[in-house]
């Protein structure tokens, strides 16, 4: 069963933890790719200098952040990569959760082809570990791009999160990655990951 709007309608820090262990589903050419969410980061526009919406900043690019909970916010970085976020709390609040890493579960060969243009069995150990262990890596592997920006995970048939009951794990809370510019916000312990999971991007 997919997660509903009510599930997403909560503080981004709470949602970021509760998404761990849930399963992201992405349909590509009629094939469903599945991956367990193992690492997330929370962003809260009102108080978070690392957020694209800090201080109420509102542009065409950041408009999805102000959307309904459960909306996808997909943005472009470094001129070639995408990052995938899910909006939380309440419409107009500009809170969201970055999906940082997945553990591949189903149709791993297609995931591998999308990521490396190779069958999974052809990958070396380094490639296998890095197949979905980072926000842009998982977007490549699950074919998530600007076409998915604004997509409603509560209604979409091709991108959503399943309420699968994987909860036998310990959650690590630590600092977020790549936000040294964000002054005091760089020290917020708003990154969450499943302890000892091999697909976490940074430990």
From Swiss-Prot:
GO terms for biological process: base-excision repair. The keyword Glycosyltransferase does not apply. GO terms for molecular function: alkylbase DNA N-glycosylase activity; DNA binding. InterPro entries: Formyl_transferase-like_C_sf, MPG, MPG_sf. The keyword Thylakoid does not apply. Pfam families: Pur_DNA_glyco. It is an enzyme of class 3 (hydrolase). It comes from the Bacteria. Keywords: DNA damage, DNA repair, Hydrolase. Its EC number is 3.2.2.-. Belongs to the DNA glycosylase MPG family. This is Putative 3-methyladenine DNA glycosylase. It comes from Clostridium botulinum (strain Hall / ATCC 3502 / NCTC 13319 / Type A).
